């Protein structure tokens, strides 16, 4: 009788997972350069869409991720700027269980950021990028979890633009395979 009415706590499954990522991007202001002149821009909020695949080892997760970041910006003397960044990352995340369903997470990711900035001219480049992550996860079911994370993101500078950096708030789902 007791088993029938006791709520079931989902088991944590170690192994492979994948899932979508959706985020709010708060990019820091930066600058684009043409020769010796530097044009500062003010960033508007943007979005992040992506997918992640990884392996859960218990207290450690290793994952690969593709993410697309987009935001608009204003250049004071020239109008608007559109930014799009394609990221290919690997990430290592440490997790600490808090009870049966909650996890605290911290990690670091690194990879390649392919940056495209467009106004009347195009500023393109690819380079090293990295991020730091802090967040929490909640297990909804045996094979489904949700994570809410904060990331600080940074790419390398290029001849045509400054570092792309900013704050990202993410919501991701993990479907255990």
Q: Predicted regions span which residues?
A:
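Short glycine/proline- and aromatic-enriched beta-strand/turn motifs that initiate or cap beta-hairpins
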Residues: 1-57, 110-112, 117, 168-177
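Hydrophobic core residues within well-ordered beta-strands of beta-rich domains
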Residues: 16, 47-49, 86-88, 104, ...
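Predominantly the C-terminal beta-signal and adjacent terminal strand-loop region
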Residues: 31, 66-74, 132, 138-177
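Gram-negative (and chloroplast) outer-membrane scaffold detector with strong preference
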Residues: 52-120, 138-140, 169-177
